[in-house]
């Protein structure tokens, strides 16, 4: 069990100015007036994930989305190493993705950074050590991030990934197990909403 309060975490994205907390439960994204916005964890988003990889069954979001300009830097929240990285090419998938591994008092924790730029993975390598606050990636554009508006999908996992992928949305029938396996990213990001 992780004692989250014993650890100090660096910001993952420097959100400049005010931001909007999105309500994506209606299944569509409406552009906010702020430069940055946040999509919620444990949010049902029926109708939003309509590409073949979701099969209409998966629409419970188990990460946090931080939306902002293309090229926005993404930083490591604590000391760790790169566990996996790669490109998921299917429409609606992550596009470029990096997964980092961290030790929190003897418990392994993985963090997925999804919807990244091509540049983010060009010189990446598994086992690369990362420091708190180190820029490890950048928000990707539509053509490289799975076809989404520019944002970071940030997700924690207590389950070791076998590749550069984790389910960012699950079936509502899997909610109980998914929330155990993929803890609330606000434990690291702080109270975004």
Segments the model singles out, each with a brief description of its role:
Residues 1-69, 175-193:
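Polar/charged, compositionally biased leader and regulatory segments
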Residues 56-90:
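Short, glycine/small-residue-enriched coil/turn segments at secondary-structure junctions
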Residues 1-15, 122-144, 148-193:
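Acidic, glycine-rich catalytic/binding loops that coordinate metals and/or anionic ligands
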Residues 76-120:
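Zn2+-dependent peptidoglycan hydrolase active-site motif and core
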Residues 67, 74-75, 113, 128-130:
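Small beta-strand-rich domains/subdomains or short beta-sheet motifs embedded
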Residues 66, 80, 100, 133, ...:
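Terminal peptide-recognition signature
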Residues 67-69, 119-124:
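Short alpha-helix capping/helix-loop boundary micro-motifs
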Residues 61, 102, 115, 151-153:
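Histidine-centered active-site/metal-ligand motif
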């Amino acid at each position: 069990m992780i004692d989250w309060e014993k650890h100090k975490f660096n910001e993952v994205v420097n959100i400049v100015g005010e931001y909007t907390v999105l309500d994506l439960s209606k299944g569509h994204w409406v552009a906010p007036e702020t430069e940055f916005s946040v999509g919620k964890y444990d949010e049902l988003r029926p109708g939003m994930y309509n590409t073949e990889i979701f099969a209409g069954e998966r629409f419970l979001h188990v990460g946090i989305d931080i939306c902002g300009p293309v090229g926005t830097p993404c930083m490591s929240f604590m000391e760790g190493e790169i566990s996996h990285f790669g490109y998921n090419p299917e429409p609606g998938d992550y596009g470029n993705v990096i997964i980092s591994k961290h030790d929190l008092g003897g418990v392994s924790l993985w963090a997925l950074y999804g919807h990244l730029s091509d540049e983010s993975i060009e010189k990446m390598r598994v086992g690369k050590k990362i420091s708190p606050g180190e820029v490890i990636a950048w928000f990707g554009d539509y053509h490289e991030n799975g076809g989404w508006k520019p944002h970071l999908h940030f997700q924690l996992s207590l389950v070791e990934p076998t590749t550069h992928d984790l389910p960012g949305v699950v079936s509502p029938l899997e909610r109980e197990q998914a929330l155990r396996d993929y803890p609330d990213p606000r434990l690291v990001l702080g109270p975004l909403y």
